[in-house]
């Protein structure tokens, strides 16, 4: 196309700080980040312009993955990793995020801290689908089912299952491939 692209990459927080400090003088035309939660937070800080009305984007990106301020161009899922030696197929049948609060998982679950952006996005989706009260009860159930206090990144959760510290873990799909 002949369009010159100047790519600046780094940690999301550092890039966001830079663009906020630059304000209207920022040369950034496009910000690509790893999570819809970050897009919403960035919008809340007034750092998006809106007006995303491209027919091509509307045709290619389903409505639930875009707003007038941002569009999802990739999808990653928070999934449940499990130990096939300690978790039966019957236990996994019908497994949902909501069922992670079931007492049958007591002492068997690991997940990152609730302050992690991926978990914030998961909780936001549960609030949207199930309401605040149901999600608050779900969170209490998940906490009571934890095998240990949350620590480490997504890979640490997967490794905890492999090490026998837990039977199931919630982590993003791509982390296993990075291990």
Residue positions per predicted region:
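A beta-strand-loop signature enriched in Asp, Gly, Thr, and Trp
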Residues: 172-179
């Amino acid at each position: 196309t002949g369009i010159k692209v100047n790519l600046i990459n780094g940690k999301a927080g550092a890039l966001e700080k830079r663009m906020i400090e630059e304000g209207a003088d920022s040369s950034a035309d496009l910000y690509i980040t790893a999570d819809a939660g970050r897009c919403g937070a960035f919008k809340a800080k007034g750092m998006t312009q809106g007006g995303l009305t491209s027919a091509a984007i509307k045709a290619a990106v389903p409505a639930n993955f875009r707003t007038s301020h941002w569009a999802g161009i990739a999808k990653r899922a928070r999934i449940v990793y499990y130990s096939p030696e300690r978790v039966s197929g019957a236990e996994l049948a019908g497994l949902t995020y909501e069922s992670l609060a079931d007492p049958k998982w007591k002492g068997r679950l690991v997940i990152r801290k609730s302050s992690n952006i991926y978990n914030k996005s998961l909780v936001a989706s549960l609030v949207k689908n199930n309401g605040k009260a149901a999600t608050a009860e779900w969170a209490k159930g998940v906490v009571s089912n934890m095998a240990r206090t949350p620590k480490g990144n997504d890979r640490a959760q997967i490794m905890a299952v492999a090490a026998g510290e837990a039977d199931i873990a919630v982590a993003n799909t791509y982390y296993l491939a990075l291990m």
